[in-house]
Amino acid sequence: MKNFILRRVGTAIIMLFAVMTIVFILVHMMPGDPVLQMLGTDTNPDPVAVESLRSQLGLDKPILQQYGSWILGALQGNLGQSYSEKIPVMASIGTRLPRTLELAFVAMILACIIGLPLGVLSAQKRGKVSDLIMTTGASLGTSIPVYVLGYLFIIVFSLDIFHFGFAMPSSGYTDISKNAGAHFLKLILPAFTLALGIAASIMRMTRSSVLEALSSESVRALRAKGLKEHIVISRHVVRNAFIPVITEIGLQMGNLIGGTVLCENVFNWPGLSTLLVKSINARDYPLIEGCVLVMSAIFILTNALVDILYGLLDPRVR
């Protein structure tokens, strides 16, 4: 098991280093000049001002030297200074990251609450109309893009086109310390938008795993002994079927971080993803690199932990 964990940790480190390299290259290949962006001019800029600012930002150094400085800084926890916000990148990310993690965490809880019981129920009702409805809904849930679902929720629940008598807030953020009620009210729509697609994936995996467990010899033997169906399901089938489901939940937790990029911008939720889009528009190299690095690190770390957990639960994969 020790060697298995070391392999997974080593793979994660290599992947993270590869991501850092690719991100640096792609950011510096972006069209547009951050210096001209900061000076606020694209035509006839003052050459002296341009060169002075370029030197100040370190953009006049050879590209390999810039890369080496960024890697060394990142290893020391220093991702540089944001061009647009004039503060350390880590400080800017530190303000936004908890909001993104909160959104992803709440969405995952909702996805599990929706997906797990529906998956078990769908397996129990296999071949019936209710199973067809649930599997069709799951297929739709996995195929509808996050931003489309977000705008549909805004139209239905914020514009109140069906005259429910209330309108949900469609954008913005309220600090929980100032108004907890308003905070959670503004969290509902983006969290459900993220949750539904994940819930559909969890439901399909749960259904598949439960069906496989139901067809096993051990379950048939328990039924032959006269055990009631709900006891067979709750005490034996669910426990055996949930190892691949736990893996799916862990993998989807990593995917949620990517899903927040669209969701946060649809609902104007001030998390890490909206900061990333803002930094791209500003050609803020250090902030772009920092945001992508942190999001990638979360994704890679989550996948590594899921693999290790799966290895603990199922020794065959070690």
Residue ranges and their predicted role:
Residues 2-3, 97-130, 146, 175-318:
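Alpha-helical transmembrane segments of integral membrane proteins
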Residues 30, 38, 42, 74-75, ...:
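Hydrophobic aliphatic residues
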Residues 11, 19, 42-43, 110-111, ...:
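Transmembrane alpha-helical core residues of multi-pass small-molecule transporters
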